[in-house]
Each structure stands twice: as C-alpha cells, then as structure tokens.
Amino acid sequence: MYFEWDERKNRANLAKHGLSFETAVLVFDDPHAISQPDREVGGEERWQTLGMAHGIAILLVAYTEWEEHGEAAIRIISARKATKRERQKYEEGL
C-alpha cells in the first residue's frame, strides 16, 4: 500500500488541525482501525478511517483509494483528531 496527497492541502491541514498527512497515515497501521464509506464526490468514493496514531491519539482520516499495478493506493484528503463521539465509537470497537 502506498500513500499520496497534495502537499498544499497537507500544509493547510497542518495549519487548520495541527496534523500532517505524514502522521495521519499511521492510522492504517492500527489493527483496530474502523473504516467506513463516507460519500461520493465527483464519481469518486470517499472513505473515513478512525484509528490510533503513535498509540496516543485517535484520528479521523478522509481519503480515496484505488488499485494501481496490483497495489492498494490511498490519497489522503484530510485528517484531524477524532471528536468525543468518534473516540467513543472507536473505543467501543476494541
């Protein structure tokens, strides 16, 4: 699996949410992460994943995914710390 993103969007996300996409990708290493479809935008299906990063912060990451050359590819759209309700949802799944 590989990750990509728009660097301008990464900088904007860091300024707005205090979170870089480099950190956001860590949620995909969480064996307890919860992924669900979000919505379709311009014919592109978007997903959200709630997961733990660095074992200390539960994050919500929005992204699209596809397969390229037989490998899963993920484009990060946005990332932020999970809300209280989202954290509860994650913790209930443990």
Predicted regions and their residues:
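Ribonuclease/tRNase effector modules and their secretory precursors
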Residues: 1-94
